[in-house]
Amino acid sequence: MKELSPSILSAELSNIKQQLEQVKAAGIKYLHIDVMDGLFVPNITIGQPYIKSLRKLSDLIFDVHLMIEKPERYIESFAEAGADILTIHYEACTHLDRALHQIKDNGMKAGVTINPSTPINILSEVLPIADLVLVMSVNPGFGGQSFIENSVSKLEWLKEVRQKENYNYIIEVDGGVKTSNIEKISNAGAELFVAGSAVFNDKYIKENIDGLYKKIR
């Protein structure tokens, strides 16, 4: 089943309880939470204390994406905060294999991702242990960017390798996803779609979600 993972980066944080209720009522199962440290990417966003507070408000699957240096330092604390999926960057982690196992050992699904300029096949050695592979289709750090077209071939490659090798990872895409391109992205192999401004860009959250789902289901 194809699913959306609305990005909290585009939500109205002062009204987050109501917006979480709205997305769940519209059939959403996942919530994408971007964590940025101001070093790996320019922006600084939320951390473990805020995620812990969100956990009290929602039983959605927390799809947490760490855009931080040396993410292995914080794996246990994000598990304690309530993350269900923890995705880390190849570029930010020296011992990627060990870190992915550490995520699993802390009871979370282990996700791995790369920046748009990094070749997708560089992840070949960790695909057997990954629960999720996230294709960044914009440069990480800011919402509202345009989709990078060469991301389509990365999705196709991941789909082909998974089928050939009988791997089990979920293929996720993040960046520039909207109603005009989500069908093409879905056909390339994506199954989980991070959508920020396409969901939270106005007060019609349910209508936005319905419009996206109609393109992929």
What residues fall within each predicted segment?
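Residue microenvironments linked to proteolytic maturation
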Residues: N106
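Acidic, divalent-metal-coordinating active-site segment for phosphoryl/phosphodiester hydrolysis
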Residues: G176-A188
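Short, acidic/turn-prone active-site loops that include or flank metal/cofactor-
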Residues: E91-C93, N115-S117, V138-F142, S197-F200
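Short acidic capping loops at alpha-helix termini that bridge into adjacent secondary structure
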Residues: N168-I170
